[in-house]
């Protein structure tokens, strides 16, 4: 058959796209020659075959064909032009053209898609120039509703054909969309827990961070100071231990600080009195062992305000008075303080 594009373009020969041949509605109960509309749209070969078939049944029909020509019957070429004119002037021609162009747009490249989109605009301009699409009364002896049935049938056929063409494309697009979603979820799960740099932060996040720092900066500083004072595994800060050791070296003969000295050490080291007391107790137990003279009782004192505990039979007060005489200067062994003569 001739392509429907020739109808869309007013019979232009530049369009080469073709659709399947037009098939008349199925009627298995009554077999008759196809109507003139379907014969003409099926192509000149079909029309010629039909006319030859009619001529064969009429006994060659040479004289009758001449008589028909004399009587003014329309030739096949003239009938085809008349059918095209009726189709293009039918009210549903725009819908038929849109359905056909919809089939051509499926999977078309961008340049072809642009050209196909411009076709309805050209048809509207044609109508604005004085060629409106209006219904012509049939000038033939065919059924008046035949053209309406033809337009409805082929609009529905082209719509179904376009849906069949779009189905694999839509399925492929849905498949790729699912794959993309899965890849995005995998990428997001791999990136969880990784911190972003200052340059990658959102401006709103930076502004919120600055506001929180201005509001809670003082409290954060206090918390940082408190956490810095906390010791790990009972170890005091290095600076505090150095200050305590300096006091220890200065008072190695009697390493028992008074309450006032403890308060002063607490202020200078940043420790509390409990930590200072514990440090001096451990330091005296580990590194302060005065050597007693043979035959002389030596008292020991467990705390600054504690009483004396005597060993031997000597006088405790006399031994306590002579206590500094048995203490020499300290010396270091393996980093630990020792007292000797």
Swiss-Prot record:
Primary localization: nucleus
User: Which parts of the chain are coiled coil?
Assistant: none
List GO molecular-function terms, semicolon-separated: DNA binding; DNA-binding transcription factor activity, RNA polymerase II-specific
InterPro entries on file: ELK_dom, HD, Homeobox_CS, Homeodomain-like_sf, KN_HD, KNOX1, KNOX2, TALE_homeobox
Composition-biased stretches (Low complexity): 1-17
Which subcellular locations apply to this protein? Nucleus
Alphabetized, the UniProt keywords read: DNA-binding, Homeobox, Nucleus
The annotated regions of Polar residues compositional bias extend over 187-196
Q: Which Pfam families match?
A: ELK, Homeobox_KN, KNOX1, KNOX2
Family according to the record: Belongs to the TALE/KNOX homeobox family.
Write down the PANTHER family for this protein, in alphabetical order.
HOMEOBOX PROTEIN TRANSCRIPTION FACTORS
Q: What does this protein do?
A: Probable transcription factor that may be involved in shoot formation during embryogenesis.
Q: What is this protein called?
A: Homeobox protein knotted-1-like 8
Whose protein is this, by species? Oryza sativa subsp. japonica
